[in-house]
């Protein structure tokens, strides 16, 4: 009788934990190193984790638990969180098997509380950012910030894509921005000296970049339509790869003829590719006669895992056009370019090729700066669809 009572009490205790955790706010942290932790806010509800990144909500879905660990997976990426529940805290790891990557994770019940400083900096606007300014491979970017008192939102635009919706706080002489989308985790910590910024970008536990920034409303990135080129002598984008069902698809198939075509170079591991794929879905719905095909280069170590990743992405976005697997085990751009003889060099995932009805490539768009870039994204969509309409009417 006593044993039964103890068992019932234990079951009731753990069921209370399970019930409570489903409705709770947490602040999560991914450990970049011993002193740096990338924060993100999330909520448990109905077997979902909902991560808040500024204006964006990211869903992670509860999967089959492993022993005494709880598992949450991304609807789009291969990554998953596996952790223990300690009632007021969680502890575990973010895993990506294809990349052999494991990032320590923990979370504390409650909300992210930051002291509201009365003397905070005004940093709203555009900033020219130079990553790795102290190295030979420096790279320019644009930081876009909006501000409400000491709360800030923003992103970084680069010639290959943006860093997603980020949020953070600004104080008397410093600020931070962070996000986590189920795969990519970023943290910016920076100090401000007048119109100059010195900062560091932490990307998970695998990449650190120093940067310097300057206020510059006139700064512009290179034209994304002028970065990638066709191989001399080629006018058409040639390809021949198998789709996720094993059928060979090539550019001279009947369905591509006498149609405007959009060919996307992408990977399921690429957040900017995800944003672009969601946009292309809307294009397909709006322009019924446009033919879209995606060509994937996957990190997954096996063909089976690569196809599984592509099937998951296609299903959860709701894509009804072909996705072809060109490569698995690596997304190396040199190897990729060798499989795509029509292009001189592959600069970025994603890259879009737009052809006319004669299959001639008329434009190449490198990278993707998506919804987090605000007006820049709106302008891109307007220009892209105007050109698409022009090709359709030719």
Predicted regions and their residues:
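Bacterial Sec-dependent signal peptides at the C-terminal "C-region" and cleavage site
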Residues: 1, 10-23
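Surface-exposed beta-loop interaction hotspot
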Residues: 101-133, 224-231, 236-239
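N-proximal helix/coil linker or "cap" segments that precede and/or mark the start of modular domains
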Residues: 202-242, 256-258
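Short active-site neighborhood of thiol/selenol oxidoreductases, capturing the structured segment around
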Residues: 249-274, 278-280, 292-293
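Structural microenvironment flanking redox-active thiols in thiol-disulfide oxidoreductases
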Residues: 275-318, 329-338
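Structural micro-motif
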Residues: 318-322, 339-353
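Thiol-/selenol-based redox modules, centered on thioredoxin-like
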Residues: 348-394
């Amino acid at each position: 009788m006593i044993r039964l009572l103890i068992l019932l009490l234990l079951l009731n205790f753990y069921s209370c934990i399970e019930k409570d955790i489903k409705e709770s706010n947490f602040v999560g942290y991914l450990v970049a190193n011993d002193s740096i932790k990338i924060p993100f806010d999330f909520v448990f509800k109905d077997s979902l984790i909902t991560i808040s990144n500024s204006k964006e909500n990211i869903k992670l879905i509860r999967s089959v638990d492993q022993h005494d660990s709880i598992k949450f997976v991304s609807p789009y990426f291969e990554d998953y969180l596996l952790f223990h529940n300690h009632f007021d805290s969680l502890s575990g790891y973010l895993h990506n098997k294809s990349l052999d990557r494991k990032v320590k994770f923990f979370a504390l019940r409650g909300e992210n509380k930051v002291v509201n400083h009365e003397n905070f900096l005004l940093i709203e606007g555009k900033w020219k950012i130079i990553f790795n300014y102290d190295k030979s491979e420096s790279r320019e970017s644009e930081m876009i910030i909006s501000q409400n008192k000491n709360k800030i939102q923003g992103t970084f635009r680069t010639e290959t894509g943006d860093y997603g919706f980020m949020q953070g706080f600004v104080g008397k002489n410093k600020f931070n921005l962070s996000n986590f989308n189920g795969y990519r985790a970023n943290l910016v910590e920076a100090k401000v000296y007048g119109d100059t910024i010195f900062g560091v970008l932490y990307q998970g536990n695998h990449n650190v970049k120093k940067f310097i920034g300057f206020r510059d409303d006139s700064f512009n990135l290179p034209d994304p339509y002028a970065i990638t080129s066709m191989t001399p002598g080629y006018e058409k984008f040639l390809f021949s790869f198998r789709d996720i069902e094993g059928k060979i698809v090539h550019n001279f198939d009947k369905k591509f003829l006498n149609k405007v075509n959009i060919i996307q170079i992408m990977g399921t591991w690429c957040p900017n590719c995800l944003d672009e794929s969601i946009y292309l879905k809307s294009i397909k719905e709006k322009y019924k006669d446009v033919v879209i095909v995606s060509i994937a280069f996957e990190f997954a170590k096996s063909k089976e895992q690569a196809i599984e990743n592509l099937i998951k992405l296609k299903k959860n976005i709701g894509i009804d056009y072909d996705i072809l697997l060109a490569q698995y085990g690596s997304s190396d751009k040199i190897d990729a370019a060798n499989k795509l003889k029509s292009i001189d060099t592959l600069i970025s995932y994603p890259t879009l090729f737009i052809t006319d009805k004669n299959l001639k490539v008329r434009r190449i768009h490198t990278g993707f700066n998506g919804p987090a870039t605000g007006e820049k994204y709106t302008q891109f969509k307007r220009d892209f669809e105007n050109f698409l309409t022009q090709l359709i009417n030719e």
